[in-house]
Amino acid sequence: MHKHHNGLKTAALFGVLWAVLLALGALIGAGTRSSAPIWIMALVGVGTTFYGYWNSDKIAIRSMQAFEVSEAQAPQLYQIVRELSARANQPMPRIYVSPTMNPNAFATGRNPQNAAVCCTEGILQLLDARELRGVLGHELMHVYNRDILTSSVAAAVAGVITSVGQMLLFFGGGDRRNANPLAMIAMALLAPFAASLIQMAISRTREYDADEDGSQLTGDPLALASALAKIERGVTMVPLPPDQRLVNASHLMIANPFRGGAMNKLFATHPPMRDRIARLERMAGRPLQ
C-alpha cells in the first residue's frame, strides 16, 4: 500500500515539475523574440545531468574519498552484501569504504551491473552486524529500484527550469508586447525555487520506498529502525562539512550528513528520521526497544 501510494506521489510530483517547466516556456514564448539562448543553456543542463547519471558511481565515490576494499579487508561487508544480492537475484556490487567518521552509507550506479556500495568508517564502528544488514538492504534497493535514474531525471528537469529562469532574468528583454514583465520576473525567480522543492520531495519519497523495500529484503524492519536512530545521533556528533562536492552527493546517503537547520529541513532530501522509524515500527508491528 505504501509503495503504491509513493509511486503515485512520485508521478504526481513529476507532473507538477513538468507543468512548471511548460508554464515557464509558455511565458518565454509570449514575451521574447528568440528563446534560442535559453534552450541552449537548458540542453547544457540536461547534458550535464546525463553525464552525472552515467558517472554517478565515480562522482559520489570520489567526493567521499572512498577506496575499494577486498573481501579479505572487509569480510563482514562482503558476507552481508553477497547474501542480500543473492536473495534479490542481483549481481554483486563493488564495495567501498570512506575514511570519514560521519556514520553514513550509500549505493550508486546507473544499474545493478554497474553498482557500488560504500560505507563510512563511522558507520562500520557504530552499528552491529544486524543494523548494518538493515542499512545495506536499504541502499541496495535504491539501485534495484533505479532510483539513480529517477533522481537524475528530476535533477534534469529542475536544472532546466533553473537555467531557463536565470537566462530569462538576463536575456528576457526582447519583444514584451504580449507579456507581463512582472509576471516574467516573478516566474523567473519562483520557478527554480519551486522546482528545487519538488525535486527534494521526489527524493524523500524514494527514501521511504527504499526503507520499505530494503526491510522486505532483509525481513527485519527494526534492524533498520535501530540503525537510523543511531545514525541520527552520530551525524549530529560528527557532521560533514558543507563542501559543494559533498552536498551534491548527499542525496545518495542514508541520512543527511550535515548539521540540521530550518532551511536545511525545507530543502532536505531525506524525510524526518522520526517518521522513517515510525513507519518501520508499523511494518514490524511493534515499537523499537
From Swiss-Prot:
It is a multi-pass membrane protein. The keyword Protease applies. The keyword Cell division does not apply. Keywords: Cell membrane, Hydrolase, Membrane, Metal-binding, Metalloprotease, Protease, Transmembrane, Transmembrane helix, Zinc. The active site is at residue 139. Pfam families: Peptidase_M48 (PF01435). One of its GO terms (cellular component) is plasma membrane. Binds 1 zinc ion per subunit. The chain crosses the membrane at residues 11-31, 36-54, 153-173, 182-202. It is found in: Cell membrane. Its cofactor is Zn(2+). InterPro entries: HtpX_protease, Pept_M48_protease_HtpX, Peptidase_M48. HAMAP family: Pept_M48_protease_HtpX (MF_00188). This is Protease HtpX homolog. The gene is htpX.
